[in-house]
Amino acid sequence: MQIVDKSFQNFDKFLEISNEEGAFALINKPKTWTSFNVVNKLRYATKVKKVGHAGTLDPLAEGLVLVAFGKKATKEINNLILLKKRYLAQFKLGATTKSYDSEFEEENIKDTSAVNLKIIQELIANNFIGEISQMPPDFS
């Protein structure tokens, strides 16, 4: 099985590898697309029958989706999902929305001028380290 990087220029060779050995590619999912949209578009564009992804990103999130091409690669997806992941997030302080994301208009707007990096780091260290159980919002 092969992992190709952005320097890999031979698309026909990629398709050959996908069908014979299986291959993985990191795809930058745009905002509003679902991970399933990415898979469907790639399946259609490449004509590879077996295409799958190793984890769902929220439609409002932008980010990398690991996409498996070919039967051998898609069989490995369940093993990959169990691996540890790291996330990088951007957030805005001082407002809420009905959906807890950018889908609805901001409300309850507060002044955040007194907030600094030290305060944020302390809040994270005291509240968001280790295993966390959360209740999903009504809009999810």
What is each stretch, according to the model?
Residues 1-140:
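Catalytic/RNA-binding core of pseudouridine synthases
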